[in-house]
Amino acid sequence: MSTQVDEVKSEKRLFVIFLLVHLIVWSTIGLVRTVLPTDSLEGIFWGSLHDFGTPKHPPLAGWLTYLAFLPFKSDFCVYLLSQLFIVGGFIFIYKLAKYFLNETASMLSVIILEGCWAYSYVTGYYGFNPDVVLLLVLPMISYYFYNCVHFNKPKDWLLLGIIVGFAFLNKYQTALVIFPMFIWTFFFRKEVFKNKFFYISMIIAFLIFSPHIYWLVEHEFLPFMYFEGELDSTGWLNHFVAPMLFLVVQFAVTVGSLLIFSIAKLKFNSPFKLGEDYKKEDVWFLLLLGLTPLIVHLVMGLFMGGTMRPRWGFEFWFLLGIMLFYFFPFKEITKNQFCFMLKSAYVVMIIVFLSLGTLLSVEKNYRSRYPVETIYSDLSKAWAEECDTPFKYIGGYIEWTLPITIYAKTHPITILDTFGFKNPWINQEDQKKNGVLILDRIKEKIVKQSFQACPYLPENYKIDPVPYSFELTNAFGQSRTYDIYYFIIPPMK
């Protein structure tokens, strides 16, 4: 008995080391870039506005990104925040797993998630965004919900309400986990609907989310315009291809975890067969929470077509490890089996880390190696030659303008998508008095965006974009020339 206890303690130490290694490795990979990913840049910009909404999402992720970046103006702090959320999510997955699995299997249900690209490659490439926040809050919601319906502690109901409220304040997709929880409760815990703490929890969540509801009303439900713009009006075939592509990408995202689990099964002659003595309510808890969000996304694909993003489903794989070990259990997980799967996870980590690091180092892409100082210096000189006002506003393609807003000395304000109604924080009169610089890679778009950003321009206003070229160099000194355009709309009375 003491030997078994010692083995579990040893495995726990290895598990903690694994979490620390994951935190360190994936917090540093992004430093190969010269600028943060666009999602993180958007977050910093939105967070700096201190508002209760954005043109795309509720505000929480933006606030967090801005707070992480603000003290030291450091990209590393944003990458570190991302991995702190992921490791936090791992901890709550482990805590939830212990209700379904033994101690060793619970740790392994987290460890094999290293093979799920949502926890490594994707966060390393896209940085901190609302999806990363979900990687923490969804396991937290699931854990506290399970606690609430089984143990009915007031503290857990209070925490559940707070977490759900902030989860909705981060992304509306939180509903895709809340919805199956209601279904499960209806069939297996009807008495919960008579519990006063259930309603207190709902009220707490609503109160936390309510400032955003007020913001939505004040701003004519701006994020839903973004969603409407994502709907695909192209050929009908896309509406069938998109769900199929979604499924293929979901398999690709989870293939690393599936391989770690499957190879261990084969190596140790553990058959792929369902376990015995399942509790019906636990089976449906995992199936509903684990699969309903993905099914809903498939249905969404039928409506959205080609504009559906496969990565919208990545954050819902947090139950993958638990489901694998629960439905296809090992008869007994020995120390050798534990170490084999742990080593496999490290091998996957190294492979993915080197692959992503190489990609980010080799690519000559403005998304990862944007020469902010050079472009800002050149545009500032061009602005000074034409205008006697400060270079205060910049519009155009956000992947060109946001790096300048975040990193440049004077932080010119980005006009998102160059639509005034999508930028409620901008004072049109002040913009008119100071002028705007429009920046884009496509000449024809400059004309369209100029009129969108400045609705006060007369219809016959002549717009003649100026060509501009710059060199972008990767980590190995190889360069690429980008040809873009800009146009300065001078101050007007």
List each model region and its residues:
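Transmembrane-helix signature of polytopic, membrane-embedded enzymes
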Residues: K12-V16, I93-C116, L135-L136
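Hydrophobic/aromatic-rich transmembrane helices and adjacent perimembrane loops
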Residues: H50, W284-F285, L291, L302-N336
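Transmembrane-helix motifs of polytopic, lipid-linked glycan transferases
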Residues: F76, L80-L101, M140-I141
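Membrane-interface transmembrane helices that cradle and orient dolichyl/undecaprenyl
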Residues: Y99-T104, I141-D156
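Transmembrane-lumen/periplasm boundary regions of multi-pass, lipid-linked membrane glycan transferases
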Residues: F166, V177-D282, P293, L298, ...
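Aromatic/acidic, Gly/Pro-rich catalytic loop(s) in extracytoplasmic/lumenal soluble domains
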Residues: P424-K493
